[in-house]
Amino acid sequence: MYFGTDDSHLHKEISLARNQGYQILNVSYGSLPENVKGDRAKMEQAFELALKHTEQFLQNVDWHSYGSILFISKSIGTIISSAYASRHDLTVKSILFTPLADTFSFSLAGSIAFHGTADPWAETEIIQKLAQQKEVPLFLTKNANHSLETGDVLTDITILKTTMERVERFI
């Protein structure tokens, strides 16, 4: 299951999960507030709206009919997927791409995370500390932004390959 605002960022990761036999559900959040960075009230509003849409979208899913549940999420989606799993007492495997600090306020057993050290949305030191506290394996990508990209195409291709290999091993 993919939690994010734009599935184009994780198309290859979703394809890996599909190839491993996972059914894919792309959770859509509808319209969220803009310009939320640095505005705690807007961030909380975005979270509440996204979680509400997620609850509605997934209300008829029979989680007990699945042998294994994998959540793939990015950015705000990491908070939403973690909150949803917690609310519904689900045992899931989670791949957290560019998680925000609030993601780590939930149980994250069975998760791995990927973070770029130049991510303007989450400070590396904070993410490292929180991941260590929750015992979440964290893969850092040096000089990468919130999309795990550096701006150098060849470097980004190498990053993508390394990331995909790690994701495939995890799945």
Regions found by a protein language model. Give the residues of each.
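Active-site nucleophile loop of the alpha/beta-hydrolase fold
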Residues: 1, 29, 95-103, 116-118
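Gly/Ala-rich beta-loop-alpha elbow adjacent to hydrolase catalytic centers
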Residues: 69-82
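A conserved short beta-strand
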Residues: 88-101, 110
